[in-house]
């Protein structure tokens, strides 16, 4: 405790604690998005698009596996192999000069997402291959995607995994159970149809909005089911035994 004499009077100066900068919260959000080689590149595209449109996400750390680049080329005709972020920006509808997306090489285990001391809100792997899911479940990662997911779990941040495989074998299911028990959110790429999608984007977006819900990212679409009574023109029938 410090003392100070001012004009003959003794004052006691109470100690103050400096606020640790890593604990300061902000309305601005940062996430890591990883894309792996499972089918469903459009899920990654629409997730990035809606995160960018949310108005609260200020940085997205993007990591892509080699297989993800190949699948995106086959499914969507886009070449993401270049390290130029302009291609990604165009793919998700951002201006070419946007700095929202920060690309990280798969082998760069010194990148921001590899450290728990770097503050961010969470991570999503979309789509998530069974190989990546298994590596995360085992804790024996070999690349930045695995490491970033491990960090997200150990720091008790939100980790969303979007597996896209069919059928699941017992190993896949056991890995998903293990990750769920560790705190991960498992959201299979299984879109619903009760919202009557008119095109593939509406079909995909229904699942993407659930991903954003679990990440805590606001969006403009209502995803809460309110019952058939709130849908005009619906006929509710019951069957009595």
Q: Predicted segment positions?
A:
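Short, low-complexity, charge-dense intrinsically disordered segments
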Residues: 1-7, 11-22, 26
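A cross-family phosphate/adenosyl-ligand binding-site feature
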Residues: 27-159, 167-241
């Amino acid at each position: 405790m410090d003392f100070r004499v001012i004009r003959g009077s003794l004052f006691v100066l109470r100690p103050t604690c400096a606020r640790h900068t890593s604990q300061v919260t902000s309305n601005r959000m940062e996430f890591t998005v990883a894309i792996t080689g499972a089918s469903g590149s459009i899920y990654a595209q629409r997730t990035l698009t809606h995160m960018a449109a949310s108005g609260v996400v200020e940085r997205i750390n993007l990591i892509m596996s080699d297989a993800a680049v190949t699948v995106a080329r086959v499914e969507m005709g886009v070449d993401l192999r270049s390290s130029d972020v302009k291609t990604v920006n165009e793919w998700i509808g951002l201006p070419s000069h946007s700095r929202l997306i920060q690309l990280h090489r798969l082998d760069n285990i010194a990148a921001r997402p590899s450290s728990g001391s770097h503050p961010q809100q969470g991570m999503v792997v979309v789509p998530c291959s069974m190989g990546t899911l298994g590596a995360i479940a085992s804790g024996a990662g070999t690349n930045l995607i695995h490491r970033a997911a491990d960090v997200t779990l150990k720091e008790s941040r939100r980790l969303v995994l979007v597996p896209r495989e069919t059928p699941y074998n017992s190993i896949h299911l056991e890995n998903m159970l293990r990750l769920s028990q560790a705190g991960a959110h498992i959201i299979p790429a299984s879109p619903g149809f009760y919202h009557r999608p008119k095109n593939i984007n509406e079909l995909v977006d229904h699942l993407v909005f659930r991903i954003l819900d679990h990440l805590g990212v606001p969006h403009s679409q209502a995803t809460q089911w309110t019952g058939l009574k709130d849908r005009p023109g619906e006929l509710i029938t019951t069957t009595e035994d």
